[in-house]
């Protein structure tokens, strides 16, 4: 029984300070650094893709690499605003409707990846249309590098001892400082592996091996599908948000509900890209 686990059967939580360093009243956290690293990597990697003309249809990238320099600010706003608004709407609406002044308090935590995706998607659409860029290719350019940022942020979640997994007796279960007396799945690291390393590798093969950037929308569809499937899988090991709990049957979570449409949308995007390529062949 899990309730009779001995302390030796699980791992102690590593003593890592969530704050990397302080400069006066300013504290730099691993979580914030994760977002910065994610945005900067997607910017750098996107420029690398745009400089590789052979990856694109007719050897013609959809935009100049320098265009991404301007998009960085748009992306940051999309991630932060979308992530926060998504968390408020999807995960703790009753609290924030009663405490609206707490909504801007990002330093207290509370970001939704699904909301961040919606915010960034809106930013990409507006930016692409303002510059005359094909929207689907804009999606592809950014999506190809996003998994690395996801992986870093999930590691930061682990360091912060948040979003931990369900109680478990697996040998690698961890005693989280604020996770109660029983060991739990380090589900943040599962997500870092699947949403970060594995998904980046899959997209890397699609981009550099299968040359799927020549089919606008395919890489973005693969990213959305891959993330959705990864998130659904990890949700079986992740503790549901305390303020929501299980939505049905002791297994269905909000993360699953929000991920299913992503999988369907991603599959449709890949089908659409293949169909368009077949028509133009």
Curated annotation (Swiss-Prot):
EC annotation from Swiss-Prot or TrEMBL: 2.5.1.145
Binding residue positions for a 1,2-diacyl-sn-glycero-3-phospho-(1'-sn-glycerol): 154
InterPro entries in the cross-refs: Lgt
An example GO CC term for this entry is: plasma membrane
Q: Which family does it belong to?
A: Belongs to the Lgt family.
Q: Name one GO molecular function term.
A: phosphatidylglycerol-prolipoprotein diacylglyceryl transferase activity
Q: Name one Pfam family in it.
A: LGT
Tell me the function of this protein: Catalyzes the transfer of the diacylglyceryl group from phosphatidylglycerol to the sulfhydryl group of the N-terminal cysteine of a prolipoprotein, the first step in the formation of mature lipoproteins.
Task: List the top taxonomic levels of the source.
Answer: Bacteria, Pseudomonadati, Pseudomonadota, Alphaproteobacteria, Hyphomicrobiales
Subcellular location(s): the record lists: Cell inner membrane
Mode of membrane association: Multi-pass membrane protein
Biochemical pathway:
Protein modification; lipoprotein biosynthesis (diacylglyceryl transfer)
Q: What class of enzyme is it?
A: transferase
Where exactly are the transmembrane stretches of this chain? 23-43, 71-91, 107-127, 133-153, 189-209, 217-237, 247-267
According to UniProt, the name of this protein is Phosphatidylglycerol--prolipoprotein diacylglyceryl transferase
Sorted keywords for this record are: Cell inner membrane, Cell membrane, Membrane, Transferase, Transmembrane, Transmembrane helix
Q: Which GO annotations describe the biological process of this protein?
A: lipoprotein biosynthetic process
């Amino acid at each position: 029984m899990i309730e009779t686990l001995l302390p030796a059967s699980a791992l102690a939580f590593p003593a890592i300070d969530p704050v990397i360093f302080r400069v006066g009243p300013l504290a730099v956290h691993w979580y914030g650094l994760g977002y910065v690293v994610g945005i900067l990597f997607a910017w750098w990697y996107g420029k690398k893709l745009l400089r590789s003309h052979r990856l694109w249809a007719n050897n013609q990238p959809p935009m100049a690499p320098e265009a991404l320099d301007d998009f960085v600010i748009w992306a940051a706003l999309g991630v932060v605003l979308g992530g926060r608004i998504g968390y408020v709407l999807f995960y703790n609406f009753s609290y924030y409707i009663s405490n609206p002044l707490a909504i801007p308090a990002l330093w207290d935590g509370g970001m939704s990846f699904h909301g961040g995706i919606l915010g960034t998607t809106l930013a990409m659409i507006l930016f692409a249309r303002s510059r005359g860029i094909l929207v689907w290719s804009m999606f592809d350019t950014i999506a190809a590098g996003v998994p690395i940022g996801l992986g870093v942020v999930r590691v930061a979640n682990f360091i912060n001892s948040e979003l931990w997994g369900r109680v478990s007796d697996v040998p690698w279960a961890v005693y989280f400082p604020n996770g109660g007396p029983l060991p739990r799945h380090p589900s943040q690291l599962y997500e870092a592996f699947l949403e970060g390393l594995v998904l980046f590798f899959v997209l890397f093969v699609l981009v550099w091996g299968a040359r799927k950037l020549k089919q606008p929308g395919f890489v973005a569809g693969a990213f959305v599908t891959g993330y959705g499937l990864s998130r659904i899988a990890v949700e079986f090991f992740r503790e549901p948000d305390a303020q929501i709990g299980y939505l049905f049957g002791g297994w269905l979570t909000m993360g699953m509900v929000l991920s299913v449409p992503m999988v369907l949308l991603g599959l449709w995007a890949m089908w659409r890209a293949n169909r368009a390529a077949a028509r133009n062949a």
